[in-house]
Amino acid sequence: WIMGHMVNEIYQIDEFVDLGANSIETDITFDDDAMAEYSYHGVPCDCMRWCHKWEYVNDFLEGLRRATTPGDSKYRKQLILVVFDLKTGDLSSSTAYKGGKLFAEKLLRYYWNGGSNGGRAYIIISIPDIDHYAFISGFRDALKKSGHEDLLAKVGYDFSGNDDLNSIRSALHKAGVKDREHVWQSGGITNCLLRSLDRVNEAVKNRDSSNGYISKMYYWTIEKYATGRDALNAEVDGIMTNYPDVIVNVLNEDSFKNRFRMATFDDNPWELFKR
């Protein structure tokens, strides 16, 4: 999965898919009542990126729905996975549940179209703070109570704060998520800084172990050819990048073209890939 980073305006969906992304990451901010308000990152953000692009969440979700609904004039077949980077910093552990409930209701209305012919992309809800695990509980409960528990088949989970893996596993369990139940694990740092592959290697080892909790592992934010090669050699499942075309080119190199391919809609993002 090539994951286009910081896609916060509707026009950027086409921009990143045109560059080769089959997945995008979108930042979501919340108001004082725990309601998702904007697709917006703000400062600081990655080097060489404009941090202030935004849409109202409802508008972005409708644009995203069109881009991922077969038959729509805006449909982009390649776009199969969306990561919502949830900026929950202004939520408390007590309001996180409410935030998850309200976000699920918003997705149900504006993205899944009330459960009728909505967007088909798989969704990852990515939370930076393991203390906000109740966001996941609220999200799951809202879909169950609305009679749309079936949509949870399209939803995965990630804690993105680079916490200790055992602590993340514990937070997932508290949220009601079992080991390998649609669990993506991120690892990385802003492109402005350097980071070793230690975190990636630890997560990949967990993913591939008989008693791990991780289904897929992705690395962020990659810019350079050399770093892309290192990530693929570490056998990650996804790469988040500001330059999808760079990763496409790396995948086409002799060293990788017979080992990896781009994921399609027929590839289940929750299944552990046996290497």
UniProtKB/Swiss-Prot annotation:
Mg(2+) binds at E25, D27, D85. The keyword Transcription does not apply. It is found in: Secreted. It catalyses: an N-(acyl)-sphingosylphosphocholine = an N-(acyl)-sphingosyl-1,3-cyclic phosphate + choline; an N-(acyl)-sphingosylphosphoethanolamine = an N-(acyl)-sphingosyl-1,3-cyclic phosphate + ethanolamine; a 1-acyl-sn-glycero-3-phosphocholine = a 1-acyl-sn-glycero-2,3-cyclic phosphate + choline; a 1-acyl-sn-glycero-3-phosphoethanolamine = a 1-acyl-sn-glycero-2,3-cyclic phosphate + ethanolamine. GO terms for molecular function: lyase activity; metal ion binding; phosphoric diester hydrolase activity; toxin activity. Its cofactor is Mg(2+). One of its GO terms (cellular component) is extracellular region. Gene3D superfamilies: Phosphatidylinositol (PI) phosphodiesterase. The active site is at H5, H41 (nucleophile). It is an enzyme of class 4 (lyase). Disulfide bonds join C45-C51, C47-C192. Keywords: Cytolysis, Dermonecrotic toxin, Disulfide bond, Hemolysis, Lipid degradation, Lipid metabolism, Lyase, Magnesium, Metal-binding, Secreted, Toxin. Binds 1 Mg(2+) ion per subunit. One of its GO terms (biological process) is killing of cells of another organism. Its EC number is 4.6.1.-. InterPro entries: PLC-like_Pdiesterase_TIM-brl. Expressed by the venom gland. It comes from the Eukaryota. Belongs to the arthropod phospholipase D family. Class II subfamily. Dermonecrotic toxins cleave the phosphodiester linkage between the phosphate and headgroup of certain phospholipids (sphingolipid and lysolipid substrates), forming an alcohol (often choline) and a cyclic phosphate. This toxin acts on sphingomyelin (SM). It may also act on ceramide phosphoethanolamine (CPE), lysophosphatidylcholine (LPC) and lysophosphatidylethanolamine (LPE), but not on lysophosphatidylserine (LPS), and lysophosphatidylglycerol (LPG). It acts by transphosphatidylation, releasing exclusively cyclic phosphate products as second products. This is Dermonecrotic toxin LamSicTox-alphaIV1i. The lineage of its organism: Eukaryota, Metazoa, Ecdysozoa, Arthropoda, Chelicerata.
